Amino acid sequence: MSSAYELVSNYQPAGDQPQAIKTLNEGLENGLAHQTLLGVTGSGKTFTLANVIAHSGRPTIIMAHNKTLAAQLYGEMKAFFPNNAVEYFVSYFDYYQPEAYVPTTDTFIEKDSSVNEHIEQMRLSATKALLERKDAIIIASVSAIYGLGDPKAYLSMILHLRRGDIINQRDMLRRLAELQYKRNDMAFERGTFRVRGEVLDIFPAESEHEAIRIEMFDDEVERISKFDPLTGSIITKDMPRCTIYPKTHYVTPREQVLDAIEKIKVDLAIRQKELLENNKLVEEQRITQRTQFDIEMMNELGFCSGIENYSRYLSGRPEGEAPPTLFDYLPQDGLLIIDESHITVSQIGAMYKGDRSRKENLVEYGFRLPSALDNRPLRFEEFEALAPQTIYVSATPGKYEIEKSDGEIAEQVVRPTGLLDPVIEVRPVATQVDDLLSEIRIRTKNNERVLVTTLTKRMAEDLTEYLDEHGVKVRYLHSDIDTVERVEIIRDLRLGEFDVLVGINLLREGLDMPEVSLVAILDADKEGFLRSERSLIQTIGRAARNLEGKAILYADKITGSMEKAIGETERRREKQQLHNETLGIVPQALKKDVADILELGDMTKNKRKVVAPKIKLSEVAEEGASYSAMSPQQLEKAIQKLESKMYQHAKDLEFEQAAQVRDEIDNLRKQFIVNS
C-alpha cells in the first residue's frame, strides 16, 4: 500500500512493536472505531504510532493533555516525518482571563488576554495542512475541542490567484482587507501586504519564512513568485498559482455579518422582554447597552470585542448545536490518537461544565445574550460523535478506553532494549525514612538517582529538610513550580547536580529519566487518588528505564490498589523475561542525551531554503542562558525587540546580521513553547 508519508528512522520495530503495529493496522483496515495501545514506559509507543500513521497514509490528529507533552510529541514526530506536514495546534494565549461575574461581591471581570503570534501562525498552518494535504499530522492539546471558525466560511474567503488572471489591483487589495490583512509598506510582517507600483507583496498569515509576490501588467497577473521576506531572495520563481488564506480562523463574509446583526437584534428584543417581566431592570439596561454597542462595532468594523459570543449567529448554527472545531477541518478518512488517554479523555469530559457555569452567570445578570452559551467547547457526547477512528494510548488505560475498545487492546509490554519492569519490594512504614536514607546512600555511590513520592506537601518539605541535614543532595518538586523550572530541575537531576527528587503528584506521566534506579513510594497503603492502581503503576514506571530499576512501597498492609499494581508489574516483568530468554536478549541500558529533554523539533526545518549561520539554542538550565529563566511575557518582549533589530539590519542592507538575529528569534520561539 503506497503511503503519503515518508517515515525516517535508524530503527526497525523490535520487542512487542511489530505485533502492536500489525494489530492496530488490521483494526484500522477492518473499520474498528476504537482501539487501545497499552504500552509500558520506554517501549517506544511513539515509534509504533509513527509506523501505524505511515502505513495508514491518513491525516491524523494526536491529542495530548498538556502543552509540554504536545511539544515533546511534536519534536518526536517531526524527526520521524521530516518531509511531511507535522503541525502544532495548542491554545495561542500566553495569558487568558475569561469574562466572569461574581454575584456575591457584584464584581464583573473583563476578558483579558495576550495572544502568542508564533503559535497563532502554527495553528493557521495546521488547518491549512489539513485542508491541502493528505500527509498532515497535527499535534494538539485539548484546545482542539474549543470553537474555531466555521471551515465553510473560512474556505469561502480564500483568495485564489493564477498566472494570467484578469483582476483589478484595487479589487485585490479590497479582498485582502476582507481577509483581515493590513497594508504596511514600512514593516513587512506576517498578516500584512505592501504595494510598490504594480508589484504586490503578501506575507501569508500561516507562513513563517515565505512571502508571495504578485507582479501585475495593468490588470493581468503576469508573474507569481515566492520569496524570503527578510533577504528578498527568490525561493520559487514563476509559480502557476497561489492561495492566500484568511489571517484568522474567525473571518466572516460581510453579508453573513449583516445577517447575524439582524438575528442578534431579534434575540435582544426577546431577552429585554424576559428581563422586564421578571422586574430585572438593571440587567435589562445592561444587556441593551452592551449588545447595542457590539452591534454598532460589528456594523462599522465587521467585528467587536468578544465577537466569539455571537459565533452562533455568524456561523448560522441553530441554538444548542455543537460549535465548529479542529475536527471539522479533519477529512472524513482522518485518524485520531489520544496520548496518555487515562488523563486526556477525562480532561475532554471536564471542559464543558466549567465553561457553562461561568457563562450562565453572565447571561443571568445581563452581561451576555443566551447565545453566549453556544460559544463553548464540545460536550463529551458531541466529541464522541465527531471523533473518527480512534487509538487510545496509555501505560494504564482507563475503564472508558477498555470498554470502548471492546477487548481490542494491542499490548506493548516488551521493550526493544530488553529492559525489565522494576523489581518491587514492600517494606514497613515505621522505619521508612531511615530505610530510605540507607537506600539513597547505596544509589548515590553508584552515581544513580532516586525519586521519592509523598502524600502531602508538608511531608515532602519535612523529608527534603531531613535528607538535606544528612548530607543528601536533594530537591523538592511541587505544584508552585512553573513548567520551565520543572524542566530545569529534571535536567539538573539527570546531570547529577543533585541525587534525590522529592514530589507529590508530579512524578508520573511524561518524565523520561534513564538515570533513576529507585522509586520510593511513602505511605503506599493510604488508598486514594495518589495511591490508586493507575497512579502506582505510572509512578513505578519511572524506574523502568534503568537496568537496576527498583520500586520500594512503604506500607503496613497490602491494599487492593497495591495488589493490582504489583500483580500487573510482575505479569509484565515475567513476559519480558520470557521474551529475553527465548531470543537470548541481554537488556541494554537506555542512553539518552540530557539535552534531549528539551528538544521540541526544529520548527523551521524544511520550511526555509536560505541557509544562514547557525546560532546555538539557549537551552533551559544551561549556564549563562540569559533567556532560559524568562517568563513567556518577557520572552515575547525580547522577541519583539529582536524583530525591530532584524528589520533595521535588513533596511540597512546588513543581511548577514539580519539572518543571525532571525535565527536567534527562531530559537527564542522554541524556548517560548518550553516556557509556556
From Swiss-Prot:
Biological processes per GO annotation: nucleotide-excision repair; SOS response
Keywords for this protein: ATP-binding, Cytoplasm, DNA damage, DNA excision, DNA repair, Excision nuclease, Nucleotide-binding, SOS response
Stored CDD domains: DEXHc_UvrB, SF2_C_UvrB
Motif residue range(s): Beta-hairpin: 92-115
UniProt GO MF annotations: ATP binding; ATP hydrolysis activity; DNA binding; excinuclease ABC activity
Entry-linked InterPro entries: Helicase/UvrB_N, Helicase_ATP-bd, Helicase_C-like, P-loop_NTPase, UVR_dom, UVR_dom_sf, UvrB, UvrB_inter
Helicase C-terminal domain residues: 432-598
Residues at which ATP binds: G39, V40, T41, G42, S43, G44, K45, T46
Compartment annotation: Cytoplasm
One Gene Ontology term, aspect cellular component: excinuclease repair complex
Function: The UvrABC repair system catalyzes the recognition and processing of DNA lesions. A damage recognition complex composed of 2 UvrA and 2 UvrB subunits scans DNA for abnormalities. Upon binding of the UvrA(2)B(2) complex to a putative damaged site, the DNA wraps around one UvrB monomer. DNA wrap is dependent on ATP binding by UvrB and probably causes local melting of the DNA helix, facilitating insertion of UvrB beta-hairpin between the DNA strands. Then UvrB probes one DNA strand for the presence of a lesion.
Family, as annotated: Belongs to the UvrB family.
Oligomeric and partner information: Forms a heterotetramer with UvrA during the search for lesions. Interacts with UvrC in an incision complex.
Name recorded for this polypeptide: UvrABC system protein B
Organism, as annotated: Aliivibrio fischeri (strain ATCC 700601 / ES114) (Vibrio fischeri)
Taxonomic placement: Bacteria, Pseudomonadati, Pseudomonadota, Gammaproteobacteria, Vibrionales
